[in-house]
A protein has these predicted regions:
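Protein kinase-like catalytic domain
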Residues: 22-25, 74, 105
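Flanking helices and flexible, charged tails adjoining ferredoxin-like Fe-S electron-transfer domains
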Residues: 29-63, 71, 92-93, 99-209
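Aromatic-flanked redox-active Cys/Sec active sites in thiol-based oxidoreductases
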Residues: 8, 75, 91
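Ordered, amphipathic secondary-structure segments that act as subunit-interaction surfaces
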Residues: 63-81, 85-86
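Short amphipathic alpha-helical segments
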Residues: 2-4, 57, 85, 123
Length: 209
């Protein structure tokens, strides 16, 4: 199963993924025209503030299985496409009850007027995995726009394995660096005592009491 994998440590907060997503879900699919369409196309990926200073995090639907939004939707607007392994929102069935948004653990479901042919009213909007692009052999718009490598498209198991290998390597590197610079217990105290003793010896040598 292919999916979009997020590397938050590589996100630079440029928000190019947001713009590319909005254009991909516009009527014109043209970056020069899409911003002026009515209703204005909206991004389904959102770059937010990270957990540490000066960091960003691209947040998008994880297409959970089972998906809480699918389980609570009273009209089956939220449904899973088993063939393509994505959770989709059918704007024609959506009644904007917001049950899906309330149970979404990642807070990625928003409500906007549909811009790509769905009913001209506010409906639930979320990432659809760029199913049309992927079906035609392209990669998701957000991944194509990301030049920092924060978004990667590929087989889920392979991406997880690569991510685990990267994290393990980082942990080993950090641990080695920490061990190389760590002093044995008590050394700091001995160094302080030595400095004091040297100071006293210098005073005695120069005839100071």
């Amino acid at each position: 199963m292919k999916t979009v994998f997020v590397n938050p440590e590589r996100c630079i907060g440029c928000r190019q993924c947001e713009f590319a997503c909005a254009v991909a879900h516009s009527r014109s699919h043209d970056a020069a025209i899409a911003p002026f369409e009515t209703p204005r196309p909206r991004s389904r990926i959102h770059v937010g503030t990270g957990t540490t200073y000066n960091t960003s995090f691209p947040n998008k639907c994880r297409h959970c299985d089972p998906a809480p939004c699918v389980e609570v939707c009273p009209t089956s607007s939220m449904h899973r496409d088993r063939e393509r392994a994505v959770v989709l929102a059918d704007g024609h069935k959506c009644i904007a009850c917001a049950m899906c948004a309330m149970v979404c653990p990642f807070d990625v479901i928003t409500f906007h007027s549909a811009a790509n042919g769905a009913p001209p009213r506010v409906v639930a909007t979320k990432c659809d995995g760029c199913v049309e692009r992927v079906s035609s052999g392209e990669i998701p718009a957000c991944v194509e726009a990301c030049k920092a490598g924060a978004l990667v498209f590929g087989d889920l198991n392979e991406l997880i394995a690569a991510g685990c290998a990267r994290e393990t390597s980082a942990m080993l590197t950090s641990a080695t660096a920490a061990l190389a610079t760590r002093e044995p217990d008590g050394v700091a105290g001995w160094r302080a005592w030595g400095a004091s003793a040297t100071h006293v010896n210098e005073e005695v040598r120069h005839g100071k009491p």
